[in-house]
Amino acid sequence: METRYTHSPEDIRHYSTEQLRKEFLVESIFVPGEVRLTYTHNDRMIFGGVTPTDKPLTIELSTELGVTYFLERRELGIINIGGPGSIVIEGTEEPMKKQDGYYIGKETKDIQFKSEDPANPAKFYTVSVPAHHKYPNVRISIDNIEPMVTGDSSTLNHRSIYQYIHPNVCQSCQLQMGYTILTPGSAWNTMPCHTHERRMETYLYFDMKEDTRVFHFMGKPDETKHLVIANEQAAISPSWSIHTGVGSSDYTFIWAMCGENITYNDMDMVPMKDLK
């Protein structure tokens, strides 16, 4: 497990491109046959990829957590962005095709991840945050989620937001997680942009061609910086930072948040005139 520490806005003012990428970009997430996780001290979120091939994988306990098993004091969200597979939760196997999700509550001890075809493995994107209460495990299908459609084709930001782990779908302590699909011809996500001082967020960008890039903007609104992001890479967004991006071609992204509350619309909008 890789660890990333927190930063003040003043810390990053003079960062080089290399320094910024080292601190806020996670480049290697889905590695066949491996579990790749990142522990960010921003609200203590753990996120990453589980990519089983010819044998099941489990999330092994790390000394950073100081507990006897991974979800002893945590909850977990999962979305499959790869081939068909399954997760085995305390002996019960659940099939997971692409876009299927799962919420797994605190105190769940045994979780295994499997792929049907090692040549086309499942890619389980996982996000875990601290939890104070055990809520029921819930299987989540994108087919059962009413998307929130927002933006407009004239502003190149028309998109459908599927809220997977959200009070309308399932209970959670503080984790929110969802899947945003841009309408063909749109390029911007989360524009106009915002911050939310009460929550941090991560973005996983995927479903991108090899030569497609997303220019992900971050930083304080009056002092923005950017990360150039390739397929299946993720960005860490502290609570004080804007988080918005524009793609050179089609892409999809998964967002995940945690912090003080689970009120999706609790955000501070940034007028375009204030961006620099």
Model-derived features: positions:
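Hydrophobic, proline/glycine-rich low-complexity stretches
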Residues: 1-62, 66-67, 71, 75-76, ...
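Short conserved catalytic/interaction loops centered on acidic-Pro-aromatic/His motifs
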Residues: 214-217, 246-253
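Conserved metal-binding segment of the jelly-roll/cupin
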Residues: 96-116, 228-249, 258
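Conserved hydrophobic/aromatic beta-strand scaffold that supports enzyme active sites
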Residues: 78, 93, 101-103, 124-126, ...
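Glycine- and acidic-residue-biased ligand/ion/polar-headgroup-sensing regions
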Residues: 39-56, 65-91, 191-231
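Acidic, low-complexity central loop/insert segments
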Residues: 82-130
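Double-stranded beta-helix
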Residues: 118-159, 254-276
